Amino acid sequence: MARQTEQSLRSAAVKTLTTGSFLFHGLEQEPLFQALDDQTLVTEKLYSNRPVYTAFRPQTWLEHLYVVVDGGPVIMRSTPLDRVTAITYPGGCFGMRNLSVGFGTVARAFPSLVEAYKTTDVIKVPGAVVQTLYEQNAEFRHRYALLFELREKFQYHLLNCSTYPPQAVAALLRALVYQERNLGSQPKGPKTEYWFDLPIDLIARACQLNHRTVEQVLKGLTKAGYLKPNKASDSTHDLVQVVDPEGLKAVYGATRDKVSWWPLK
């Protein structure tokens, strides 16, 4: 019975990876997946506001790639400004820039803390498995490279956050829309709407704004029709629903005299 339970858990982990993650989607027929033993894939719960690891330590590499399957987001933040520089939602991965696989050997930066902003369920995939798939599967190799590209483009959006609050918040939202669209996580269904678990504190730390200013910008974006107001219940309090992602481009490129709804001129 114990053996059957372990086998079931392993099969569930493989199924979750191959159906619910961008990187491993559709790879269930790979011989490597079919040959995984019971101890290879590690399912783990990361608790909120607890460090997972410190990224980019000199001559230090991770042993696993982390695949987010539920909860989150997981963030990376810089020192000393404590600015959020990466946000990962379910379906995405983190840790690839700290694995000695592909571009990971050259994607170095200064030490940065990685933590679960909210409780997160992950599957840890051994680096050896990632390396083998990278060498043997062209589609996997393409997706793996795209993960690095999306990280760079996310940070590029953040570099374009100006001191003008509407533009700064729009830059973050555009970064998330671009990231999740390319990962295939959103939008779901015929509507081009994007849902993000995005607390005000997280927006403030990513855009270098104070909390009150972020609240006012979100109200303005909602009144202008870019966002949809959520219900006041606790379960949806942190959800930001983008209903006009293309319209956000105008705010992203705006200067002070171009956003009529912002009261602070």
Language model: regions and residue ranges:
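Cyclic-nucleotide recognition modules
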Residues: A86-E149
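Short beta-strand segments in beta-sandwich/barrel cores
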Residues: L41-L46, G71-R77, D121-V122
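Glycine- and acidic-residue-biased ligand/ion/polar-headgroup-sensing regions
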Residues: E63-L81, Y89-G92
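Phosphate-/nucleic-acid-contacting segments
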Residues: Q179-K265
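Cyclic nucleotide-binding regulatory module and flanking cytosolic helices
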Residues: M1-T54, G92-C93, L99-G102
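A generic structural signal for short hydrophobic patches within well-formed alpha-helices
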Residues: P73, V130-L133, L248
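Polybasic "coupling" helices that flank or enter modular domains
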Residues: R141-Q208
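A short beta-loop-beta micro-motif enriched in histidine and acidic residues
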Residues: D38-V42, R50-L65, L81-V84, A109-F110
